[in-house]
C-alpha cells in the first residue's frame, strides 16, 4: 500500500523528489501556518506529515481527531517545540526532526552579525545612502582585536 505523505509548505524540489520515492505526495501551497482543521485533517488522512515551525500540533489537535492514521510527524526543521511529542507518541505517532540542518547557516549568520557590529556596516550603508559619508573611518575595529563572551 502506498504511503500518503502530506507536506505542509512548498519545500525544495530535492525534498519533494525524495518524498515522491516513498509515497504519494500532497503539498500544501499556502506558506502560512496551518489552522486547527488542516492539522486535524493531516493526522486523519495521511500516513506521514512533514510540518514546519508554525504548525502547532498540540494536545488539543490530537484530542480532536476521531482516528489518527498518521504514524510519523517528520518535522522539517531542528526545533520541535511546536509538537507535543509525548501526546504524539501516546497516539502512536513518532516525531522526528533534522538536527544539524541549519548549523552552517547559523554560524554564517553569527559571523555576519559580528562583522556588522565590528565594522559598523549597517550604519555605514545608511550614511552612504544619505550622501553623508565623511573621511572618518567607521571600520576601524576588527574581529581579531575584540574579545567575545568574557
Labelled PLM ranges:
Residues 149-150:
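Hydrophobic alpha-helical segments, chiefly the membrane-spanning helices
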Residues 1-96:
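An N-terminal-biased, well-structured beta-alpha scaffold segment characteristic
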Residues 91, 99-141, 146:
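Phosphate-binding beta-alpha-beta segment of Rossmann-like dinucleotide-binding domains, i.e.
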Amino acid at each position: 500500500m502506498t504511503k500518503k505523505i502530506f507536506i505542509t509548505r512548498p519545500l525544495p524540489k530535492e525534498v519533494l523528489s525524495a518524498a515522491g520515492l516513498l509515497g504519494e505526495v500532497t503539498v500544501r501551497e499556502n506558506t502560512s501556518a496551518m489552522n486547527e482543521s488542516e492539522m486535524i485533517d493531516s493526522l486523519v488522512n495521511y500516513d506521514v506529515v512533514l510540518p514546519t515551525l508554525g504548525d502547532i500540533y498540540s494536545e488539543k489537535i490530537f484530542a480532536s481527531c476521531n482516528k489518527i492514521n498518521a504514524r510519523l510527524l517528520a518535522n522539517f526543521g531542528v526545533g520541535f517545540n511546536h509538537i507535543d511529542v509525548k501526546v504524539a507518541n501516546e497516539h502512536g505517532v513518532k516525531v522526528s526532526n533534522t538536527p544539524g540542518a541549519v548549523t552552517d547557516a547559523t554560524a554564517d549568520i553569527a559571523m555576519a552579525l559580528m562583522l556588522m557590529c565590528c565594522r559598523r556596516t549597517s550604519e555605514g550603508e545608511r550614511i552612504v545612502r544619505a550622501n553623508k559619508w565623511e573621511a572618518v573611518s567607521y571600520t576601524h575595529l576588527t574581529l581579531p582585536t575584540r574579545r567575545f563572551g568574557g
